[in-house]
């Protein structure tokens, strides 16, 4: 364990380097004032002989080591220790614990003798440094995993800023079809080559007699000059030996130049004259890239894009590299034992670490985060091997579904009902859901971090239709107990017939149940005997042989959704595991709590009124002034100080699941429990769901863009995915305003139904036919227009090798698949699609959603989903692109592999097996978030809300530092924080910091969530806003263009939130004096707005108002008068003649009509004045922050939102606000700020709702 911990710590230490070097100057000054950061010098054995390093007193010595290893001047050192005052410093102590170490102290770097492991690590590191390491082939992370496109887009932006050429939106087609090139990496120039190869020599491993002499490894290096050197890795360093390919003589070779060095890097620089120059060129090329785009992943699994460059393209070309297959040996030694870890022991000892001080908590959470990341990766790798049949089962005689496996100290089983545990709940379907819910339950318990309660490391992996559970092995779980003893110590034993209780489990389960709002309740075994349990009978407690208390099977921490199961007139749901979500229970608890507090306050007020009346007479002469203020503050305190200890809400998770109470009292209690659960279910249906629909209807929150963002939004609100159908019905009833939502909901149901159908076929298909199966099913769903009767493309010679394989997928036709999808949609979501639903599919978006749900990576080319899109006179199997005949020239990947082109007689289909390049596993993990980092962030937010700006910013920077230390830089949580922080800096007018953080948010979001995720679009839109606020408008437009291109791929045109973006673009174009282009974007925005909100809505009037001004600036005075009249008429009919919006429009209309001749000059003057003012405070320019999905957008400037009266200003001044003060105008969100900065929007909610 000690060794593993050391390794963990060592590999984690890379993040602080980023911290100390990568932060903004404000943070550094902040820390220096706190005395946290100081500089020390490091004395080196070779050139440059001394370097300066910035360190923090809280850092560990190994963090300093890591900083040294990553500095260009000290790359070559990997095997060394540090000394101070002649004494060796322990790597695992903090710098503050090193006696006498202070600013400007000198520590000495001393080179150590190598061990075999150190030598292997050195070779790996040097290969990476000199660019000799090819891409590792990886069965977990797919092609182009962790891709970021930011660099190529910012290059385009930089080119636009420096040249005087037209801006990036000048010829942009807003309604154009999507280009798949948007999400593909650009082909890059090859990096400078420093050496031809560095590999292990065929003379490995070292013979015994030479191990005694300190030989560790034998290497072979071929320099750029073509010379081959055989090199011995020795305890003292590296030297050229006398071996040849045929003769073994591993002793030093006399050399004209220096033939030995402690570091391999130094040795190669002696041997190859061109090495130093080419190595410098390589570093220069790498430095052009943003560090974050190449930084290796440590605490997260990188995102694998669904669309990748074809195998034939230069981006994914497969290069020869002899060492690629040797890397496993270099990483983990001869017997691979170095990577075997006792996962369970590591998890539990980490959980037992002290958590008394902040330092303790940082260390503990950092270790936890790294451990979970390592485990999730190892478990996912093993699960892939199990799914492929590469691991031998422990019980080979059992049925496939009942087989269990152990690989890399992780226990695997299938998420299927192999032994009949869930027979009464729905069999395999129930088992599949149960393991998914179990991970969610374990994640919740890990987050609570209850002292003395332990969970096994758990991961669920979906791969090739199979669901596989990987768990760390709990000591004692396989132990056969004595006769009469139960296998389980607490909870139901193998079903609910036998129930075990154990006094030791009561205190820890009590804490758990209190936190998860679970009620202590009675259950009865098969003999009718009562047992009082703290949790659900399904949740089990096991006393491990290590003496720890483990909680298992957490799939029932919330009650069943009783109303769903009892719904009249519905098809039977596939299983009985439909439970409520934890978020809903929490939301219901808050709802009941607020009712309790209100009732309590009312009761107090009533009591106070009586008390005050009696006191008034006796104290009439007391100081009346003070009394008034005191009474107010007391009343406020009274409201704040409502004692909630009297309030409790806990739900019984076992109601309606077959328990039979025995006595009348028990029956009465049970009925009460059931009533509470039914009220919770009703709360979901009557309050939560209608509120979500209303919020999206009113435009109060950001709108989902694809299946992923929709699911996240529902889950955040506590709504289960099974309610997609109900939501679609509610959304339909709201009419045209929510067409976009209905479309997304229906598309999500179809994609999920297809996923279930595809999985049922894939589960039994032999590996070589997987691509054929998927391609055929996709053709039946998406390619029926191209070929109404597609045939599965199966290699006949391969088929003969698998006589018993399942080829039932061949029989699927478009008609049978549609019927199957309708059946799934009906039973799973209780929704009936429109009769001709398959004719209105958005093919590209559905293909993307399905690919993400199944883990597909498709080759990029122009897919044809209609006959009209098929290319003329091209081998038909090649297909062509989604609605994009026009854009053919753009795709680099219409690549015809020889195999495809060779059989032109095949009928055309949309997708061929060769298009499915790879399938990646989908991992559901139980990693907890860092509570420490979240506490700091919350404290910072509260301080800012209380106007303590200095303290708030310090706390938020502290939270940023904790996030980066605990999660590493590349992690979705860190991306989220960068995003929030950039917004905060934007609001406090610190533009440079906002841009810097927004840029980081873009890159980390791209690499962890995907280059075309909804979060990535939002990150790009915010970055464009902040760039514009900093005066880089051309750059901002490049980012907007990229975001719009992404939007076309993931949603299509006319997304409700795109109104905000189009208005932002229009305002930016006005800023560049591109009046005619600006007008186009306002017109596009108006089109979407009218389609969503109707011609007579206030939102439409607001855009008409802005458009009229844009027309005036574009010297179209006649058009301007017409649009302003339309705006005036809408304001008049909706808000009445006295409303300030109506009056303002009227004044403008008069002016525009009177001055029709001189209008152009008038508008130009105003524009010039507006620009002068903008330069003073660009932030109120009228661009608007894009809200995140499901959240309302923050008001962009704290101060202005508090000032509601702008009435007295002149038209000239108001132009600034009107022309873009609320550029989103489609949304009535951000009411506060809109009312302040744009009087036209006042009162819009009631009229537009």
Swiss-Prot record:
Gene Ontology terms: cellular component: cytoplasm
Basic and acidic residues composition bias: residue spans: 613-638
Biased composition annotated in UniProt, kind: Low complexity: 1192-1205
Domain named Clu: residues: 321-565
Positions of the UniProt region annotated as Disordered: 1-34, 610-638, 874-907, 1178-1249
Compositional bias (Polar residues): 1178-1191
Record-level Gene Ontology MF annotations: mRNA binding
Alphabetical list of Gene3D superfamilies matching this protein: Tetratricopeptide repeat domain (1.25.40.10)
Quaternary structure, from the entry: May associate with the eukaryotic translation initiation factor 3 (eIF-3) complex.
Its job: mRNA-binding protein involved in proper cytoplasmic distribution of mitochondria.
Protein name: Clustered mitochondria protein homolog
Species in which this protein is naturally found: Aspergillus oryzae (strain ATCC 42149 / RIB 40)
């Amino acid at each position: 364990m000690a060794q593993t911990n050391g390794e963990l710590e060592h590999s984690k230490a890379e993040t602080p380097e980023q911290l100390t070097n990568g932060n903004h100057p404000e943070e550094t000054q902040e820390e220096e004032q706190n005395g946290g950061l100081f500089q020390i010098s490091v004395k080196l054995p070779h050139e440059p002989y001394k370097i300066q390093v910035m360190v923090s007193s809280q850092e560990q010595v190994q963090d300093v080591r890591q900083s040294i290893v990553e500095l260009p001047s000290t790359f070559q050192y990997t095997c060394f220790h540090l000394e101070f005052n002649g004494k060796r410093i322990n790597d695992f102590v903090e710098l503050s614990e090193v006696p006498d170490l202070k600013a400007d102290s000198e520590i000495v770097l001393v080179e150590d003798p190598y061990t075999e492991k150190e030598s292997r690590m050195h070779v790996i590191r040097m290969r990476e440094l000199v660019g000799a390491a090819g891409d590792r082939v990886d069965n977990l992370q797919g092609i182009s995993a962790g891709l970021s496109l930011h660099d190529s887009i910012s290059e385009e932006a930089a080119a636009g800023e420096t040249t005087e050429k037209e801006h990036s939106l000048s010829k942009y087609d807003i309604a154009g079809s999507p280009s798949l090139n948007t999400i593909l990496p650009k082909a890059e120039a090859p990096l400078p080559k420093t050496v031809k190869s560095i590999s292990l020599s065929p003379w490995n491993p070292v013979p015994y007699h030479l191990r005694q002499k300190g030989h560790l490894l034998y290497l072979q290096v071929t320099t750029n000059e073509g010379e081959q050197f055989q090199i011995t890795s020795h305890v003292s360093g590296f030297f050229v030996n006398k071996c040849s390919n045929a003769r073994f003589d591993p002793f030093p070779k006399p050399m004209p130049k220096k033939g030995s060095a402690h570091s391999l890097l130094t040795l190669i620089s002696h041997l190859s004259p061109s090495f130093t120059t080419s190595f410098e060129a390589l570093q220069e090329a790498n430095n052009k890239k943003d560090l974050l785009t190449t930084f290796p992943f440590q605490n997260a699994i990188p995102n694998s894009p669904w669309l990748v460059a074809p195998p034939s393209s230069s981006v994914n070309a497969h290069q020869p590299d002899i060492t690629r297959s040797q890397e496993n040996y270099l990483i983990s030694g001869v017997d691979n034992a170095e990577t075997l870890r006792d996962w369970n022991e590591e998890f539990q000892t980490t959980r037992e670490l002290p958590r008394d001080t902040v330092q303790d908590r940082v260390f503990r959470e950092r270790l936890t985060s790294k451990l979970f990341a390592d485990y999730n990766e190892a478990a996912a790798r093993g699960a892939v091997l199990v799914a492929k049949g590469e691991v031998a089962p422990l019980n080979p005689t059992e049925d496939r579904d009942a087989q269990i496996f152990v690989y890399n100290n992780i226990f695997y089983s299938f998420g299927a009902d192999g032994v009949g545990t869930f027979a009464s709940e729905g069999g395999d379907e129930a088992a599949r859901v149960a393991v998914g819910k179990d991970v969610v339950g374990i994640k919740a318990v890990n987050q609570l971090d209850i002292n003395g309660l332990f969970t096994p490391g758990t991961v669920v992996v979906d791969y090739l239709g199979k669901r596989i559970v990987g768990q760390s092995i709990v000591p004692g779980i396989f132990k056969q107990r004595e006769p009469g003893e139960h296998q389980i110590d607490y909870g139901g034993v193998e079903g609910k017939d036998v129930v075990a209780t154990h006094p030791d489990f009561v205190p820890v389960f009590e804490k758990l149940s209190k936190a998860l709002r679970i009620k202590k309740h009675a259950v009865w075994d098969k003999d009718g005997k009562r047992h009082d349990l703290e949790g659900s009978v399904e949740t089990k407690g096991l006393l491990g042989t290590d003496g720890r208390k483990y909680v298992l099977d957490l799939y029932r921490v919330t009650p069943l959704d009783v109303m769903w199961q009892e719904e009249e007139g519905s098809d039977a749901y596939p299983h009985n595991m439909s439970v409520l979500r934890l978020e809903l229970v929490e939301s219901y608890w808050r709802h009941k709590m607020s009712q309790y507090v209100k009732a309590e306050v009312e009761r107090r007020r009533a009591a106070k009124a009586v008390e005050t009346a009696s006191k008034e007479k006796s104290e009439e002469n007391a100081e009346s002034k003070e009394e008034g203020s005191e009474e107010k503050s007391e009343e406020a305190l009274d409201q704040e100080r409502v004692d909630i200890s009297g309030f409790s809400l806990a739900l019984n998770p076992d109601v309606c699941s077959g328990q039979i109470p025995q006595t009348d009292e028990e029956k009465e209690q049970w009925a009460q429990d059931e009533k509470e659960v039914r009220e919770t279910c009703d709360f979901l249906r009557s309050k939560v769901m209608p509120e979500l629909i209303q919020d999206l209807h009113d435009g109060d929150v950001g709108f989902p863009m694809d299946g992923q963002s929709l699911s996240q939004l529902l889950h955040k609100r506590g709504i289960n995915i099974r309610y997609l159908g109900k939501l679609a019905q509610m959304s339909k009833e709201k009419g045209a305003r929510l067409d976009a939502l209905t479309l997304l909901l229906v598309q999500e149901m179809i994609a999920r139904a297809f996923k279930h159908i595809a999985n049922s076929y894939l589960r039994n298909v032999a590996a070589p036919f997987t691509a054929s199966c998927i391609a055929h099913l996709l053709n039946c769903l998406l390619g029926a227009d191209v070929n109404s009767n597609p045939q599965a493309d199966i290699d006949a010679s391969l088929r003969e090798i698998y006589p018993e394989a399942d080829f039932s997928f061949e029989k699927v036709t478009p008609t049978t698949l549609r019927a199957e999808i309708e059946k799934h949609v009906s039973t799973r979501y209780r929704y009936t699609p429109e009769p001709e639903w398959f004719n209105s599919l958005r093919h590209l978006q559905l293909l993307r959603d399905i690919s993400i749900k199944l883990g597909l990576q498709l080759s990029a080319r122009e897919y044809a989903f209609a006959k009209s899109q098929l290319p003329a006179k091209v081998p038909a199997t090649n297909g062509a692109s989604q609605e994009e005949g026009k854009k053919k020239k753009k795709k680099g990947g219409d690549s015809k592999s020889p195999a495809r082109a060779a059989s032109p007689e095949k009928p055309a289909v949309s997708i061929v097996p060769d298009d499915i390049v790879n399938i990646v596993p989908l991992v559901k993990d139980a990693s907890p978030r860092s509570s420490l980092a979240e506490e700091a962030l919350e404290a910072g937010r509260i301080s800012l809300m209380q106007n303590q700006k200095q303290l708030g910013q310090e706390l938020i920077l502290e939270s940023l530092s904790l996030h980066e230390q605990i999660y590493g830089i590349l992690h979705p949580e860190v991306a989220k924080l960068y995003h929030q922080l950039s917004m905060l800096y934007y609001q406090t007018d610190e533009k440079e910091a906002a841009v810097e953080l927004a840029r980081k948010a873009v890159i980390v979001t791209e690499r962890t969530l995907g280059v075309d995720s909804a979060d990535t679009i939002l990150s790009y839109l915010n970055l464009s806003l902040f760039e514009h606020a900093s005066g880089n408008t051309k750059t901002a437009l490049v980012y907007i263009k990229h975001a719009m291109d992404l939007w076309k791929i993931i949603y299509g045109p006319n997304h409700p939130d795109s109104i905000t973006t189009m208005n932002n673009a229009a305002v930016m174009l006005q800023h560049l004096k591109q009046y005619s282009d600006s007008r186009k974007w306002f017109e596009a925005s108006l089109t979407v707005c009218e389609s969503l909100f109707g011609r007579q809505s206030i939102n439409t009037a607001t855009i008409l108002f802005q458009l009229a001004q844009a027309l005036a600036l574009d010297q179209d005075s006649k058009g301007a008068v017409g649009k302003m009249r339309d705006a005036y008429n809408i304001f008049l009919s909706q808000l009445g003649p006295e409303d300030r919006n109506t009056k303002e429009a009227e004044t403008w209309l008069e002016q525009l009509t009177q001055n029709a001749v001189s209008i152009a000059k008038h508008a130009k003057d105003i524009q010039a004045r507006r620009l002068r003012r903008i330069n003073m405070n660009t932030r109120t320019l009228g661009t608007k922050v894009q809200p995140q999905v499901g959240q309302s957008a923050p008001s962009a400037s704290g101060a202005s939102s508090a000032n509601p009266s702008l009435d007295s200003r002149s038209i000239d001044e108001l132009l600034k606000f009107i022309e873009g003060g609320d550029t989103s105008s489609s949304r009535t969100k951000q009411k506060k700020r809109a009312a302040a900065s744009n009087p036209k929007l006042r009162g819009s909610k009631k009229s537009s709702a």
